[in-house]
Amino acid sequence: MLWELKKIWYRIYQKVFKVAMCFMDWSEPQLLEGAGSVLKLPEFIKSKGINKVLVVTDKGLMSLNLLDPLFKKLEEVGVEYVVYDGVQPNPTIPNIEECKDMYNQNNCQGIIAFGGGSSMDCAKAAGARVVKPKQSVRAMRGQLKVHKALPPFFAVPTTAGTGSETTVAAVVTDPETHEKNAINDTCLRPKYAVLDPELTVGLPPHITSTTGMDALTHAVEAYIGKSNTKETIKEAEQATKLIFDNIEEAYNNGKDLEARGNMLKGSYLAGRAFTHAYVGYVHAIAHNLGGLYGTPVSYTHLRAHETDSY
């Protein structure tokens, strides 16, 4: 009986929130697209009057020297940068606090999130802490609790999976409780994003496949969700086709820029779709397992049924 009442409440909440979403700011990111487009980003940043940025990434990408061309271009145009590379596969509250402190201590004026969904989630939450210094990360969890514009935010995905470059969410792990919770607010949606397939050509096949299935999960759950619209259904269909038509080629021939570019676009469209239409049970299970075991959400989507926890 209690569960039935909860279900009714959840459905009412979804219906009310679906109506409320019509009145929110859903401005999409301004995109830089195509091979080599990341090198256009520094001049674009400079044109916004920004002279110093915090680059949020992880040690793995730093060790691959994937950011070196971006760093060189930033130096050429006169934009200073500092690097936070402590992002973990499931960013934690301490990660976010360290990142926020580095931004403030170095008087940065903007944030570049460079990497997968973890880097972008960490950067989003850190940006929220910058503009809301008196509000803890735990207090931001849930719906619409930030409601203040982040510093200028530039998202550069290096995987075609999470779609975080266009979503309003940041998923955070609490190391004390091992829970994963989302901070959801339209102000977390990046204003600018770069879809550069050259940044994904070095992904090993197993990451190409798992992140691609993450994007496909977004598209399917957005398509069948209770809060979908004509627009999200169209975006989900486009995303599904792009992923189906290109994931095998991207897996077998990682240097195929067309396939890589189409996967990035599919991930982006899936991110747009589920931002409006929500995700579903697969994500709910995967986020809980990720909090318990520290597994990346893209991998957990495929393996949830094999774990003892469920």
Segments from the language model and where they lie:
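An N-terminal, well-structured beta->alpha segment
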Residues: 1-79, 83-84
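Glycine/threonine-rich beta-strand-loop-alpha-helix active-site module
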Residues: 94-101, 105-195
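Glycine-rich phosphate/pyrophosphate-binding beta-alpha loops
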Residues: 272-281, 286-295
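Carboxylate- and glycine-rich phosphate/diphosphate-binding segment that chelates Mg2+/Mn2+
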Residues: 169-277
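Conserved small/polar residues in nucleotide/adenosyl-binding loops
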Residues: 300-307
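N-terminal small/polar loop signature for handling phosphorylated ligands or for N-terminal nucleophile
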Residues: 62-134, 249-260
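Active-site nucleophile and cofactor-binding loops and adjacent substrate-binding regions
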Residues: 88, 114-116, 278-279, 296-298
